[in-house]
Amino acid sequence: MSRGAGALQRRTTTYLISLTLVKLESVPPPPPSPSAAAAGAAGARGSETGDPGSPRGAEEPGKKRHERLFHRQDALWISTSSAGTGGAEPPALSPAPASPARPVSPAPGRRLSLWAVPPGPPLSGGLSPDPKPGGAPTSSRRPLLSSPSWGGPEPEGRAGGGIPGSSSPHPGTGSRRLKVAPPPPAPKPCKTVTTSGAKAGGGKGAGSRLSWPESEGKPRVKGSKSSAGTGASVSAAATAAAAGGGGSTASTSGGVGAGAGARGKLSPRKGKSKTLDNSDLHPGPPAGSPPPLTLPPTPSPATAVTAASAQPPGPAPPITLEPPAPGLKRGREGGRASTRDRKMLKFISGIFTKSTGGPPGSGPLPGPPSLSSGSGSRELLGAELRASPKAVINSQEWTLSRSIPELRLGVLGDARSGKSSLIHRFLTGSYQVLEKTESEQYKKEMLVDGQTHLVLIREEAGAPDAKFSGWADAVIFVFSLEDENSFQAVSRLHGQLSSLRGEGRGGLALALVGTQDRISASSPRVVGDARARALCADMKRCSYYETCATYGLNVDRVFQEVAQKVVTLRKQQQLLAACKSLPSSPSHSAASTPVAGQASNGGHTSDYSSSLPSSPNVGHRELRAEAAAVAGLSTPGSLHRAAKRRTSLFANRRGSDSEKRSLDSRGETTGSGRAIPIKQSFLLKRSGNSLNKEWKKKYVTLSSNGFLLYHPSINDYIHSTHGKEMDLLRTTVKVPGKRPPRAISAFGPSASINGLVKDMSTVQMGEGLEATTPMPSPSPSPSSLQPPPDQTSKHLLKPDRNLARALSTDCTPSGDLSPLSREPPPSPMVKKQRRKKLTTPSKTEGSAGQAEAKRKMWKLKSFGSLRNIYKAEENFEFLIVSSTGQTWHFEAASFEERDAWVQAIESQILASLQCCESSKVKLRTDSQSEAVAIQAIRNAKGNSICVDCGAPNPTWASLNLGALICIECSGIHRNLGTHLSRVRSLDLDDWPRELTLVLTAIGNDTANRVWESDTRGRAKPSRDSSREERESWIRAKYEQLLFLAPLSTSEEPLGRQLWAAVQAQDVATVLLLLAHARHGPLDTSVEDPQLRSPLHLAAELAHVVITQLLLWYGADVAARDAQGRTALFYARQAGSQLCADILLQHGCPGEGGSAATTPSAATTPSITATPSPRRRSSAASVGRADAPVALV
């Protein structure tokens, strides 16, 4: 590197020091070879000789100095930082005469690079600064000192520049030399195991390289980029210090054992330094600095080139230690080094201390810092996290926009739980085994539900406090699977958090994480999966995970799912808050309410407003004034005019949920003739199902009674003309590109009771047809005053209930109900052709460009600029989808307005569902009798426990097995299929009388005597058994029939035995024979003169339970006797309405049918008959036609 003259400059370079512990073995020193001596002489730096009287020194003064330099560099090649002048001369090396022994005391402002004090017995060498040559050193301490050098030859003309006879590079200053006498023979060397250490970061430029001050913060860990020279020198230093000057060197870093010849080949590169103080780049210290300290080298058998082979007898040339620049370090008086130097001396001495022969109190060799705990390791962890681009710790510079929401995650666990490793793996993607003893905070950007969130993670070192419990949105409890104490600590921490937060405050997402990081052969797993899941169940709303930060197992999943739970809980809280804040509509007097009947175009209109006091007349001037001022009002006034047409998008039907809602649930809007609007504004609208795809501007109003209305203009809304409405009870709202919230209602309306209008354009297309089918439709406005219908209306509105159900799905093209349109529903082929027509290009699609232009023009008027028109990603649409699949598209002017509309509609949908009474609850006229029936089922013999696992209080039932099961076994029974087990809930489903009779007649005791007669020594699962054990038992019991009771020894066919059992009304025997009949077809031919089947006989006996069992197990419901009569004839002849209803529900033809019915049609049961009006389809749901077994 060029060392030309230049201004005073300082270069600060951060170096990484690689510390390596090497294995030392005692070997005899090799004899110095001429080639080694020559190589060492070629690589040394030239300088003035310290012994001019010596012949060898006079001839080759540089070679002696080079050899000595190599000897000292093998000991240590580290120096502190210093500033120098570019044109300063290099230090001169001269022999240092002996001086009386006295301690070395650095001058003020001087840093002494004393790195280590070798352990072992006192050495005879000493340090003695003596300006006079000839003194003999007597001190017993020998520090490791070196002069920075490249090891190459010195350019000519650079020697000198100092005081004659001195090695100081500073002119005009005195010289102090430190000389080291040869030490006594080293003690017996010990053998140590070679171990690579960790890296440590150096301090900043002007500070000491030996340590860092407390005010400089934690060190930053960077990549390992140790150069060959530095690594070799440090390894050599380690070798020399550990050996104490004796023994040979065996370094794993390389570069030292090569000898002086290898060093001679090294050449300095531009801008690269091999010393910590850049002294090789800036050799000259500033003027006025103290003289350097010099000391003679000590011969060691570990060096490749010894002084004995290169020098004649005489005083050895000393090695000069350059003092640092003044003012860079505060000095210490009284012979003490600086605090940081002493700390680093202690640190390096502890590393290089031998296990034997060391001073008392020296501990064993420390392991790698990454596997130990301590403040240094914690600082390394913090530095690594700060250096990572994925994590930001306590950073005030890395911020996001205020519009980005924050998710606050707290992490709790004890010191051995592995929570720090979990967080570290999530933030940086790397593994760190250390645990923090202090609370820390982290930040990371995360994508949840397609939206960016800033996740704030707080790692709590101790127990949570009140501030933490109020701050966190979610808490992750972490424990180690191999540590019982950490598992117990989680339970204790959860109790403390619950007491601080209280039961009243909800919305806290919890997660329990078991870490597998420390599990090994020596520390096995002690916390089982069952215990962990039991604790998770006790925490409520908690999810359990097992992670491994070493390999990253489930680490990202934990934080992602916890963040998802927080977002979901927030949405639910916002929805509930919006529902609670719904305004209550005031009650108005009905005296001024004009109730108007509606009709389609050309239909009959009945106006009953004349029977009530009419509203006051409004003049044209007042009308114009009101119309002009309505734009500034939040709710435009309602003008009470004559009856105006407002088409309902849903066909009004008798018995629908919308008509069953009470007046108070509709908003109690009986005074003004119009419901109170909750939200209203202009929106763009287009229908999703009509042919017209153009966007149209509509004035949309959301009413408090659960209806959404839209009109072409605000004037039409004021006059209640040309408007359409939709009942939000049967709809849902969606936003394109967003995942809908997981809001599940307790009960919802049926999807088969709604008829919808396509669009206004479709209504206009069907006007001619509507004119020929007049039908009055009730007013959409709720009122207690219903208009009395005329005779025609009475005739049309009082059809048979079954006929009304059959006609409920048939609509005219406009969507209105018509009693004359009885066309059957379209076949799949017709639907396919209809879809094909819709997918073909039409003329209306050609006008898409014109519609887009209109929409952009409206945006231009709304925004007032062209800024957002050509941005394709700006889409402010939301969709309203009905239960039948019809879609309405609306578009707002901004994201805020769209979100406000969506939130208001969702709140109104939820309010409508909560206020609507279910039809199932309405039809329960005798709930007390049903409760008595369910209690009778529970009182049956053996029904107090589960039939399969013995769990108490089962709440589910298997109908065709006649047994009660628990909720865990019910899921397995559902997987078996309805041909094996028909599952129904005791609490959630209806229980008609025929099903109640089956459950009370059989019971768990009878069922187990049939299906579980001989277990063959197999253990029955208990209530604590796993799902796999339960499933294996249930399938063996009901699917494979392994435990089925054997038949009697009678040789009669099964058909005759079944006939006899039915005739004897033996339910248990019938159930057993039906179970055995599953192995093959059942021969039901008996010697009956009337050719009756067991089903005929059961119907004749009016036995409901046997009739139901025969039908469930595949009896031929259409079988006829010799006179062509079905079982329905015998049931009615016996007067059993329950048996008749069961047969009708399973598709039994009437008793007057022809006997020539085809067997194929007869053997396929289908639900085609209309049940009696007094009974709903109770068993039709369990008597499905997809049962694959036809046994009878």
UniProtKB/Swiss-Prot annotation:
Where is the region Interaction with EPB41L1? 1-23
Q: Which parts of the sequence are annotated with region: Interactions with HOMER1 and NF2?
A: 180-225
Q: Which GO terms describe its cellular component?
A: cytoplasm; cytosol; endosome; extracellular exosome; Flemming body; membrane; nucleoplasm; nucleus
Q: Which domain of life is it from?
A: Eukaryota
- Chain spans, region Interaction with PLCG1: 267-390
Molecular function GO terms recorded? ATP binding; GTP binding; GTPase activator activity; GTPase activity; phosphatidylinositol 3-kinase activator activity; phosphatidylinositol 3-kinase regulator activity; protein kinase activator activity; protein kinase binding
- Recorded protein name is Arf-GAP with GTPase, ANK repeat and PH domain-containing protein 2
Q: Which organism is it from?
A: Homo sapiens
Kindly list the organism's lineage. Answer: Eukaryota, Metazoa, Chordata, Craniata, Vertebrata
